[in-house]
Every structure is written in C-alpha cells, then in structure tokens.
Amino acid sequence: MAKGKDVRIRVILECISCVRKGANEESTGISRYSTEKNRHNTPGQLEFKKFCRYCRKHTTHHEIKK
C-alpha cells in the first residue's frame, strides 16, 4: 500500500485571455477545465492550449491554485 500523499492530484486550468478581458468587461465568462496531473512527473504548473468557448478560439490555459 502507498503511504503519504497521493501522487495524482486534481488541478483546474483557466483561460488567461478571459482573465485579462475580465478587467475590460468584454468577456461573458472564464473558461475552466478540470484534469489530473502526476505530482512526481510534472512538479511545475501545467499549461495547455485548449478551446475557450467564450473567446471562441484555442487559447492558453494555465493551472490555478485552489
């Protein structure tokens, strides 16, 4: 049996374009995706290009802290 902390953790990815537009009130919302990452293989923050339904294009999504 494994002891200690779980290796796989759930993370939330957030669109950085929507966050920047939030200050200008142009965006209707903020796109967020939920996924898992392996803490040992990727100790840094995740960054993916995913589709944002509010921007209507593929944008960079960064991991946010809970």
Curated annotation (Swiss-Prot):
It comes from the Eukaryota. Keywords: Chloroplast, Plastid, Ribonucleoprotein, Ribosomal protein. GO terms for molecular function: structural constituent of ribosome. Gene3D superfamilies: Ribosomal protein L33 (2.20.28.120). One of its GO terms (cellular component) is ribonucleoprotein complex. One of its GO terms (biological process) is translation. Transmembrane segments: none annotated. It is found in: Plastid, Chloroplast. Belongs to the bacterial ribosomal protein bL33 family. This is Large ribosomal subunit protein bL33c. It comes from Brachypodium distachyon. The gene is rpl33.
